[in-house]
Amino acid sequence: MVLPKIFSYDIDERINLIQTITGKKPADIVISNVNLVLTPTGEILDNASIIISGKRIAGAGKYSELHRFIGKNTLVIDGENNYAMPGFIDPHIHIESSLLTPHGFAKLALRHGTTTVVADPHEIGNVLGSRGVEIFMDAARNLPLKILIDIPSCVPATDPKFGLETTANIIGADEVEKLAALEGTIGLGEVMDFVSVLNSNKSVLEKIRVAHRYRLIVNGHAPLLRGAELDAYIDAGIWSDHESTIYEEALEKARKGMYVFIREGSAWKDLKALLPLIKNHTIDHRFLSFASDDINVVDLMEKGHMDRIINIAIEYGVDPVKAIQLATIGPAMRIHLEDHVGVVGPARLADIVLSKNIEYIKPHTVIANGEIIYYKGELKKTFNNYKYPEETLNTVKLAKIPEPQEFIPKINTREGIVEANIIEVTPGSALTKHVIEELAVKNYNVLADPNRDIIYAAVIDRHKATGSMGKGFIKGLGFRAGAIAQTIAHDTHNLIVAGNNPEDMSRAVKRIVEIQGGIVVVDEGKIIGELPLRLAGLMSIEEPETVYEKYKKITNELNNGYGLEFESFFMTLALVALPVIPEIRLTDKGLVDVRKAKLIPLINK
């Protein structure tokens, strides 16, 4: 673990804090007349003031002689009886899923009061390897948003020995050790390959051993694991999880000492199901917090980030202060930085959010590291852009563009009915269902059935130009246009394409190659929407407002023109290719039974 310098102990900085609060030196900023949310105790202190010196808080509370902290250069902010709370912390996020670079994400996250995130860049790591992680870390430095890094633990997501997919890169124990020595690392990213953990796979355990040696936090990914299997997973030295989707599952994990992150992202929303964990139990702050995991640019722009999750919790009846604790001191204690963040109090970094109301959090003034980033909704800070190497902008390599007929599964029977293994998706859930449906066969082709919401799907290797392509069917997407193709296909991020019309599927794939990554929607041979994502085929290098407008244009077209009411459509499609979340997935090698970590046939004989 090599924390950024801002977390280091600076004697001169500490002297300034002491001299400021004892009245020997004027403060840089004084915020007066606020209702101070005390996250350690769950109280609200009215008519409080916050004294800031440099990057840190010299003191916070009631002061009878406030003038003794004020000099001629002190900025005095009247809090106007607003609520002051710590900057929000997201303990687990994949920034790439926002479709934004660290620079673009920081602008939006800070607007909504987030001042610290722990990012697991395994998306770019899968595409560009440890080199991609290093580039991401470099881009994340020198931003007012503190972006701490979890080193990807599962690149690829499954053991290559299983042969489940064509992967671009491998981040092994040696790469983990190299990355652990870089400034900004705090943890080992979610250990997704729980099958290998339960099988005592030494290559996975070696990464965990490296993490423990470097005192990195080890993060988990244990969907539906219970009983002895969960014990075995924890025995490996993995201490957190954000995959709980039912209350009993989350409670068991908490009882066994796991840190439970309650996930409320764009595609999967687990807060409502896990509410009893907050409302019916007195679980210690250290073992419970909110996390977003994956959040898209539309939600960031329109609904917010951690403030959005806090507000949803309040709407569900959670006490506002408790909800704030789960986005501040809770995650701070999990990442062992509670002496720096998560509290508005002496010695802590001056990460402060002001909101007029506590029943509905709407940040209007955000201070990060003692610097005013937003003041009454207006951006006061310039964000420097990062120049990405050319190698990161050209990552889509196909052997050829598949012909339309190649997207249709073939069998040796000319006509008839067959039973197919189909992936059924559910809005708002990361899980899929393995369902068996009867499909018609015509001229040796197994046909999709749009009337039952069963469409064609394929995943194509886009890293090594092998020509490898897996075919299948998806049920439940509600997609009525001709085709959609995207280079976001967790976690290997091969090219995934789905649709009702094989000709449109081929056209969409061709366009993806031309723009070198992104999202393309085609209907009746025409491109009706596209969003270029040049950076690793995952992120746009444009400003967040531009990305939002282009993304919104596609979603509006699908909603208004084709009746698509699936809020998390793009992310749900991307997850179809992730062979570590039950029950069944599709890769460039074919259908995967996740629990067995084996390929299965598309058609049952």
UniProtKB/Swiss-Prot annotation:
CDD domains: AdeC. It catalyses: adenine + H2O + H(+) = hypoxanthine + NH4(+). One of its GO terms (biological process) is adenine catabolic process. Gene3D superfamilies: Metal-dependent hydrolases, Urease, subunit C, domain 1. The keyword Chaperone does not apply. It is an enzyme of class 3 (hydrolase). Its cofactor is Mn(2+). Pfam families: Adenine_deam_C, Amidohydro_1. One of its GO terms (molecular function) is adenine deaminase activity. Its EC number is 3.5.4.2. Keywords: Hydrolase, Manganese. SUPFAM superfamilies: Composite domain of metallo-dependent hydrolases (SSF51338), Metallo-dependent hydrolases (SSF51556). The keyword Hydrolase applies. Belongs to the metallo-dependent hydrolases superfamily. Adenine deaminase family. PANTHER family: ADENINE DEAMINASE, N-ACETYLGLUCOSAMINE-6-PHOSPHATE DEACETYLASE. NCBIfam families: ade. This is Adenine deaminase. The gene is ade.
